[in-house]
Structures are given as structure tokens and as C-alpha cells.
Amino acid sequence: MVIDISRKAASFIPVFCIITKIQAIGDKAIYLTDMRGELLEPTENTPADLYSIYNYDDDLSGNTYADPAKYYDVIIACNDYLQKAKEYRDTHVTTVDDDDYRGLISSTVRLKTWTYLMLAKIYGQAIWFDDPMQSMKDIVSRTPKNLSELVDECDKLLNTGFDGINGTYNMSWNEWLDPANGATSTNDEYKRWNMMVPGYFVLQAEIALWKGDYQKAATTILGEMSRTFALAEYQGNVANIKYMRSGSYGSNYGQQYDSEMPMLTATESVIMYDYKYNQQNSLLNHFDRSGSYMMRASVPGSKRFEDTTFNPSADATAIKTSDARFRAIQEIEKDVEYAIRKYRGFRKSGHTVAHDDTYIMIYHTSDLYFMAIEALNNMGRFEPASVLMNTGVDPFYGAGVVLGEQWQGLNCNWGLWTTLYAGFRRTYADNGVRGILGLGKRDMWQTPEDIKEEIIAEQRLEGLSDEDKIKKHNDIELVKEAFLEFPCEGKTYPLMIRVAKRWNDYSFIADFVGQKYESDLAKQAEVKAKIMGGAYFVPWDLQGKSSSH
């Protein structure tokens, strides 16, 4: 995607160089976390470096997949841009537009925050630096910060920012790139430029979850969702409402991954590619059978989608669950081989292996729901957590239920019964994570009466108060749902780690991940032991000389 920005000051152009460097890391989290996670396994074509990731090897020196150098390239570019943009503005005070400056600085602050958050989630450590550097060689003598320290630094950066500008300012690319039409521009390409950078609210919500500040996470995420649902453009007869699992979201499930361009209503932020401008990743080459086919879905991971115990069906008599999300996986030979087709196309293909320019979503509608449910559950607001996981607000609210204090942050704009605009009632409303797909209810506990004795031992809930039993059980149910919702997005392993840290119990990670090694019991035991021993992060010696640069 190339747009003429020659009319703008040349000092602002480097922000696009940051985006280019982010394109280079867009698919890394998928290879690094999902290959170690609950679903993916090698094929006959898997290279040695990727096999080492799958095998949980302790020494990854020189491993081209594990090398974090390209993440640090983004940080170096962010620091360089921040310094040079300030220097330029300081010498051109009267010619630099204040709103543009705030928007560009704030966007860069958020990109840097997101990059460090990714390092924290993948490696559990990173070297933090704010001063200009040229390469990783300039920082290897510094002491790395651990996960908790990095999350604190991300929170500080997001809210303190640079040059008095924090991460709350938005850059309106519509107005910057299409000044003739300004904010009223209907050009979808420009609107997608607004999704190049994660928003403040979604970064703040995820950071708050890592810090255990569930009130802030819930207030932040629910506030933005409710605000968006109330916009005039989403009232009345609208099939797709931004950030809402409603309308055609379920019947058209999958197009948010395989359409030619990202869906505006389902996407919060996205990494875009265009092969015509040499902007590519290698997802299709890794996953597609017409490419190098280096990774595939394991049999145990694939069978979870149809397992009525793991994934309840709406039909109590069904012998297997029909879940639209299973379209992400292609059955090659039943119970033997399953390939990933999530990025190739469920019904039609908008991308090819030769082009390999499928976009990679950073945050989308599902992320917001899962963060909201996680926050609500750990605040003890079990009723709305269960409703958002299952049927959604619409049928619950429409039943005439009087919403109590637990529902703070969710309002009538999630439903349709009291939402009127220009004489129209909203046609579609929230149907929840599972309800929009016509699935059965996941067993989200709400009261001590819901606690099942047979689950206490299975999920290691012994010794916890009833309230904590409910919270931990629901957290594990959220993780199980994430396996179905986020295959091959680089998101399930970090969620498992966050839940495990919360309860100081890593056994469920070992259990879920270990299932895909069932054909090699010795390897299964080895991997489970490593996870229980703390090897859930990708190991990398930041003080060593094994980095590519």
C-alpha cells in the first residue's frame, strides 16, 4: 500500500519505516509461541531451527526463528524517530502542526509499547532502552528486565509518553492523507491506515490484565466497546457493528482472516502487506500444502473443535460439535493429518502462496471480548462474564432482566430493546463469543452451587475459597475457548502464561501442550517437565553473541 505523502514534511516519513520493520516481525509470534503451544506440530519439511522450537530445546543460539533482533530493530527505529521528530519540531515550531505532531508521537509511543509487550510475552525478558542505538550490539551489556518489570515499563511509557505526549492521541490518517475530504473521507484504504497502530485502550487493557488491575481492564475495554456501539453509524439496520459479535459475524465467520483486505468492523489493529511493493510475510509458505508446508495442526489439537465435552454443542444429542471456527483447519486424512488454512481461505482465497501477503491482525473483536471476560471474571462479576462467553447480552437483556451492579460498563447499546436512533430499533445486537456461532454454553461457574466436585481435582482447585475456585475454573474455561478462537495467531500461549502466573499453577499448560506429543511418550514427559520447571518462555541469551546483528 503506497500513498503520496510528499506534501508533508520529510521528517515525518520515518514513521512509515517503523511500520516496515513491524511487517518483518508480524508472523514471528506465531512461529515462536504456537509451535510450542497446544496446536501446531512439525511436518516432514520442518527445518531444524523450527524443530528446536517445537522440542523446547534449551540452547537456541543462532536459531533464526528465536532471534529477537528484529523486535529490537523496531524499538531502535521508534527511539530514533522520537528524537528526530522532536529535534525537527523544536526548530520548526511555527510550521509543524501540533495535532499532527501529537498524533505521530503518540502512535510511535504505542508501537514501542506493543513491541516491548510482545518481547515480554514471548521471551519473558527484554533489555529496555530509550536512547538512540544502532543495533543490538549496543545494548547487550545492559541488564534485561523480567516480565513484570517490562509490563510496568510499558504501562509507564503508554501513560507518560515522550515530550509530554502519552499514548492517548490518535493520528487521523483520513485527514492527513486525504485533506480534501478530511474526517468525512469514505476511502476504506485510508480508514485501514487508521488501524496500523494499536489503540491506547486495547494496550492499556492488556497491560492492566498482566498487572492484575482488573477494574482498569474492564473499565477501559467495556468503555470503548460501549462507546463504539453507540455511534450513529451502527444504529438501525446494520449487519456488521464494529467490535460486536452480532449480525453476520457468525454466518460470515472467517472472512476477517481470508478476505483480500481487513474487515473494518472486525479489526482494531492490523499489520498490512502488499506483495506488489515487496511487503510479504511467510505464513502461507509455512502453513500451506502448496508452499513449503512446515507446520500443521496436531491431531489432538484439531479434535478439540468437534469434541462435545471440550466444545459443547447446542444439540445435547450431537456426537460431535459443528463449529465454524474449525474451518481454520483442513482435514487431510481423518485422525491422521490436519493442515492450517486459516490464512489461505475458507471458501475463496484472497491470497496466494506466491504472493504471501496475507494481513496479520494485532487485535480484533475477539480479543476485546476475551479481555473483557477475563477482567470481569477476576473481579467476581461472574454473571456478565458468563453471558459474554455464551449467549451474549441481547437475549439476556431482552428477557426483561433488570441489570444490576455487576453490569457496570455494559449498557443498552449492547442490546437492541432500548436502543433507538432516528426511529429505528437496532436490528442486530450482541450474541456473545459462543452464541453468535450457535454453540452450546461453556460451563462458566457463577455461584458455589455451580462447583462440581469432579472438576476440583482435575483443575487443581483444592485449598481455594469458593470464590477463587470459580475464578480459576472460569479462567481455564477461557483458555480452552481461546484454543478454538485464536488458532495460529500467537495469542494462546501468552494467555496460558498469564492465567498460570495468576494461580501459580503451570500444570494445565503442561497438560494441554503435552497432548500433542502423545505419540512420543518420552518427549511428552520431557516437555511437560520443562514447562513445570519454568521453560514456558522462548530461551534466548541476550548477553550472548548469537544474535544476527
Feature-to-residue mapping (PLM):
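Solenoid-repeat scaffolds in large eukaryotic assemblies
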Residues: 125, 217-218, 224, 385
